[in-house]
A protein has these predicted regions:
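Short solvent-exposed loop/turn micro-motifs enriched in small/polar/acidic residues
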Residues: 2-3, 156-158, 200-202
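Helix-rich, typically C-terminal accessory recognition domains appended to large enzymatic cores
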Residues: 6-176, 209-215
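Cysteine/selenocysteine-centered motifs that mediate thiol-based redox chemistry or coordinate metal-sulfur cofactors
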Residues: 198-221
Length: 221
């Protein structure tokens, strides 16, 4: 018979990888091709998720306040996963976990206020992984008895804009400014930035084009 023994997969990858891989295959109502090559991708994701909690060779989670971008990433994931669970769209839930993990890795995030809710969030998908991390976090009891996280909409509201600052149409750097900042204040903030002075050099500013919420372009010559 052309079958795959799940015991062999569990022995090689662990039960959580098999569980998440089956969820990741696609919508529940559709037939899905079985391809063991996909198991290594899920295993790689779980290792990356684990590494969020481990830095410099050991467990390392900070109680310091998290960066607003990390909180936005976490609460975007929480919102998406909760919506997907309601629709039984477990495959897109796992995609959301992967996206969040990649973003938090880039941000070098190890803050408890970000990571602890994600442990609770991932517990139905990877229960063994979640229990291990829950214990390492010093939390009492089982993660399955904790309250499932819900998103905080305030973290998802865009309050700033990362403007591309261009000189003669070529983007030279990014400048994050409040979304409600007016045109004159934007112009001042750009001109006060040391990078602007460096790119202008000995040239003169002929014109500055500012479209609030969109672009900044400085014409020099």
């Amino acid at each position: 018979f052309n079958v795959t023994n799940p015991d062999d997969i569990v022995e090689k990858y662990g039960a959580d990888v098999l569980r998440m891989y089956e969820m990741f295959l696609g919508p529940l109502e559709q037939s899905k091709p079985w391809n063991t090559q996909g198991l290594s991708g899920v295993a790689g994701f779980q290792r990356k998720f684990w590494k969020l909690f481990h830095q410099e060779g050991g467990f390392n989670v900070s109680d310091a306040p998290a960066h607003k971008q990390a909180l936005k990433t976490a609460h975007t994931c929480i919102k998406k996963v909760n919506e997907d669970i309601e629709n039984f769209s477990f495959n897109t839930s796992i995609s959301a976990f992967m996206i969040a993990t990649n973003e938090l890795t880039e941000l070098k995030t190890n803050n408890r206020e970000v990571l602890e809710p994600l442990v609770r969030l991932i517990s139905p998908f990877a229960p063994h992984l979640a229990e291990e991390l829950w214990e390492k976090l010093g939390c009492k009891g089982s993660v399955t008895h904790s309250k499932y996280p819900t998103h905080d909409q305030s973290y998802l509201v865009e309050s700033s804009k990362n403007y591309p600052v261009s000189f003669n149409g070529k983007v030279r750097f990014q400048l994050e400014l409040p979304l409600d900042m007016g045109k004159e204040d934007i112009e001042k903030a750009v001109m006060d930035d040391e990078r602007t002075e460096r790119h202008i050099g000995t040239k003169q500013v002929r014109k500055m084009i500012v479209v609030p919420g969109r672009i900044i372009n400085i014409v020099i010559g």
